[in-house]
């Protein structure tokens, strides 16, 4: 019991909000998630990790590049928001650097984003706030039943744009992050990684 009390008392001091996502409304209704991502830096790997065998069925300690490579090889799956945050973590070359960055901006908070899906002829683009194609009045409640689609290919849409904050989705294991907006709240943009290519790099 003393060890458990110690664990609980240390946990809030070592973590900070890294991102917040509001899931887009599905056309058929169903469950919708309002998710916050937290970052916690530990000096040592926890001696024991357990899962509930429902939402979490297994665990694995990996660096962000290792996790992305496993995703690319279809060993594991990530939803686009998790992939985006892993690409952001690839900016940091050490745990110390990541912890300093997180601590320096801990009081800044983070902006809640809702993605909007644009269906192209050969894939999907998940648009985020600040992107050229992000709607001025997004459908936060799902009441408008708005569907964004085009006959253009993803490549054509990329050539036409200039301000990007998007994730291109060719299939569940082929994602690409494109970001050139100015980040808010002293945050950092993710590395632009395309799992369909083999030449992406990371500082880790």
Tell what function each PLM region has.
Residues 1-85, 98-111, 153-157, 162, ...:
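Unchanged
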Residues 85, 89, 94-204:
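Core RNA-modification/binding signature centered on pseudouridine synthases
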């Amino acid at each position: 019991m003393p060890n458990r009390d110690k664990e609980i008392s240390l946990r809030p001091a070592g973590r900070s909000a890294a991102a917040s996502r509001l899931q887009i409304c599905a056309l058929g209704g169903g469950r919708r998630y309002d998710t916050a991502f937290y970052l916690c830096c530990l000096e040592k790997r926890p001696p024991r990790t357990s899962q509930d065998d429902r939402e979490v069925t297994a665990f694995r300690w990996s660096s962000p590049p290792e996790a992305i490579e496993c995703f690319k090889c279809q060993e594991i799956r990530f939803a686009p928001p998790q992939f985006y945050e892993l690409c952001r973590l690839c900016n940091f070359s050490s745990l110390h650097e990541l912890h300093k960055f997180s601590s320096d901006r801990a009081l800044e908070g983070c902006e809640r984003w809702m993605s909007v899906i644009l269906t192209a002829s050969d894939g999907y683009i998940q648009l985020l706030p600040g992107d050229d194609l992000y709607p001025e009045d997004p459908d936060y409640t799902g009441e408008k039943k708005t569907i964004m689609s085009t006959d253009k290919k993803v490549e054509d849409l990329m050539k036409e744009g200039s301000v990007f904050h998007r994730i291109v989705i060719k299939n569940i294991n082929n994602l690409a992050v494109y970001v050139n907006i100015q980040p808010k709240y002293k945050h950092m943009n993710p590395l632009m990684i395309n799992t369909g290519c083999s030449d992406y790099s990371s500082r880790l």
